[in-house]
């Protein structure tokens, strides 16, 4: 684009210079002729004045027609690159994972630069280097995550299943403990209420007659 503009500028300047020189030569010859005829030479009209090379109508028309493109070419943005087909790509380096994060492709360099600024604020906070520091504002907190009805039902069923499993384990553990405690109590009661066997007296070496009654004889 700049090469085309400079080429057109040179062509216009050369043409203007040629026209001005031709007008100057014709006016000088006319002046000589008037002097030879005795007529005073008139001043050169202002329309034939030399065109100022600093005034370039082509560049002015191009800047008026494409003001945004002219500004974008003058300024380079951080984290923004132009694709060969004209789009603008934005990317940023993640300081936590040490990897580049793709932010997308945009129609203008300014939009890509603003996307980079938002990502830089998320990654680095107040230490971020921005393209538009004058437009920094406190970002609102992200909206709460809305769950779909299917996710809500699935989470509720999973929670109920976990609660039921925990309750079942609690019942099993309490039932085993009560059974053992009941068995221990019954065993202790049996030992407490059962009569203890008395030890037998020591026996003598031989049978004693006093211990046995005398047999009775039948009457005759």
Swiss-Prot record:
Belongs to the AP2/ERF transcription factor family. ERF subfamily. Pfam families: AP2 (PF00847). Residues 19-30, 205-214 have a biased composition (Low complexity). SMART domains: AP2. GO terms for cellular component: nucleus. This is Ethylene-responsive transcription factor ERF110. Keywords: Activator, DNA-binding, Ethylene signaling pathway, Nucleus, Transcription, Transcription regulation. Probably acts as a transcriptional activator. Binds to the GCC-box pathogenesis-related promoter element. May be involved in the regulation of gene expression by stress factors and by components of stress signal transduction pathways. It comes from Arabidopsis thaliana. Residues 57-72 have a biased composition (Basic and acidic residues). InterPro entries: AP2/ERF_dom, AP2/ERF_dom_sf, DNA-bd_dom_sf, ERF_plant.
